[in-house]
């Protein structure tokens, strides 16, 4: 098994940190400190070395320390391709983020070629009652760990969708280019939908097979394209192309694309109660979310033979002793780099003896 882990992390003008240097090993790491000390900021900085905008989905300007014109995050990381230096930096003057791998610029969506990462934060506990967009992004992030190429597909799809919207709204008379764009969107949509369905199948097996202290969930996706694939229908790409053509006039008025895989919703049910997670109690929702993360970790490692970095922000808070102990044993048993934030060590004293403690 190949482990993804940080050897060192350096922050400059990042959120509340002027400068911070951390040296780490492939062991559990506990960040301990008062609220506001910057524990979550460190996790967020690490998460920037995975496709997307990090675990907070923050605006670029927000990650830069107030009154500073730039910020920099540097990491020496054991990646899928070996030891490498990664940097990501932002300058207010350009309002752009630049990411580099061994001093060569790379696109954000290329990061999944090098890293694998999973995180769980208090903000995610409301994912079942939030927007379908949040749930869809959560599912796609899971897919990235199974299929790194999925990142590029989603990025390309969003690019072509933006181009289509622009042509329609600005009334650009170029039917040939519009036809090409819609054909590309249709082809990419088919791949995205199949990747999601394949991952959900893997995940469902993992949930059903893994006996733990958390409720089992039934996973599905509510989307027209995905449903047609599940029904065994043929000519999916032609169907999508036709739908995009037929909705042009309506989408021109709306200013957006009303049909496609960007409208699909990730649905989660409490298996035993047979009700959607959004109708469960907040405690049950947190437990179901943890169960999904456990399944993702377990199956991703089995399938890819790669152990990702795991970021847990205040996860042990409000868990009973039995579930807390199960999580500790599960994660330490995987022999991976685990980052945990907490305000105190109450309830995790034994775990702390096996971890690197960083006090903020």
Curated annotation (Swiss-Prot):
UniProt record, GO biological process: DNA replication; DNA synthesis involved in DNA repair; double-strand break repair; SOS response
GO MF terms held by the record: ATP binding; single-stranded DNA binding
Principal location: cytoplasm
Binding residues for ATP: 33-40
Cellular localisation: Cytoplasm
Domain of life: Bacteria
UniProt KW DNA-binding keyword: yes
Keywords associated with the record: ATP-binding, Cytoplasm, DNA damage, DNA repair, DNA replication, DNA-binding, Nucleotide-binding, SOS response
Entry's Gene Ontology cellular component terms: cytoplasm
UniProt similarity note: Belongs to the RecF family.
Record NCBIfam families: recf (TIGR00611)
Function description: The RecF protein is involved in DNA metabolism; it is required for DNA replication and normal SOS inducibility. RecF binds preferentially to single-stranded, linear DNA. It also seems to bind ATP.
Name of the molecule in the record: DNA replication and repair protein RecF
High-level lineage: Bacteria, Pseudomonadati, Pseudomonadota, Alphaproteobacteria, Rickettsiales
Gene of this entry: recF
